[in-house]
Design a protein with these regions (language model features):
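Catalytic Walker B motif of ABC-type/P-loop ATPase nucleotide-binding domains
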Residues: 166-170, 175
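Conserved ABC transporter NBD signature motif
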Residues: 73-81, 89
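Helix-to-loop junction immediately C-terminal to a conserved catalytic motif
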Residues: 65
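Conserved ABC ATPase signature
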Residues: 141-145
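Conserved ABC ATPase "signature" region
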Residues: 113, 117, 122-138
Length: 198
């Protein structure tokens, strides 16, 4: 796992911490998928899990997103335990899943409008299209997009709700090396475009 420097050595207040995890465990039958993770992530930080297949990266992300229950430990995301979170909390998250399921007959613009309709305060669709670099494909049907362009649309769908926090699970799957470098270079811009907490 690669991440931020040890936050205990920095002057970080609780208000700046958006993810706090202590002793996170997840057991699936006889297999301990996650074995005692501790971490803190501060607002504006980009944090990554690195490891081989089966190391528990996706399981950990799904616990933080509230899609899976943990077996043990303490977890707070945006000040809330994901296992107890409601709709308002979920609206503050943007999620790019490991694999996508886009509507192939919608255009990029239509897809973003559809998903934006699920949120109380969506971002401007044109702004999101520009942010993810799909301006020339805004009116193209999803089925005509390359794999990398579809992943950029996945990112746009995660950002259209104007989230406070974005989770990316293997977001550059399907990208060629050049597109991958561009995506990672744009990550700080995406992080800085997240809305401040209210």
């Amino acid at each position: 796992m690669l991440g931020v420097p040890d936050l205990d050595r920095r002057n970080v207040t609780t208000a700046e911490v958006v993810i706090s995890v202590r002793g996170l465990r997840k057991r699936d039958g006889d297999v301990e998928a996650v074995a005692g993770i501790d971490l803190q992530v501060s607002r504006g930080e980009i944090f990554a899990f690195l490891g081989p297949n089966g190391a528990g990266k996706t399981t950990t992300i799904e616990i933080l997103e509230g899609y899976r229950d943990r077996s043990g430990g303490d977890v707070e995301v945006l000040g809330v335990d994901p296992q107890q979170a409601g709709r308002h909390w979920r609206e503050q998250l943007g999620v790019v899943l490991q694999s996508s399921s886009l509507y192939p007959n919608l255009t990029v613009r239509e897809s973003l409008r559809l998903f934006g309709g699920y949120y109380s305060r969506p971002r401007d669709v044109g702004e999101v299209i520009d942010l993810v670099g799909l301006g020339e494909k805004a009116d193209a049907r999803v089925r005509t997009l390359s794999g990398g362009q579809q992943r950029r649309l996945d990112l746009g769908l995660a950002l259209v709700g104007d989230p406070e926090l974005v989770f990316l699970d293997e977001p550059t799957t399907g990208f060629d090396p050049s597109a991958r470098r561009t995506a990672w270079a744009s990550s700080p811009a995406c992080a800085s475009s997240a809305r401040p907490s209210s």
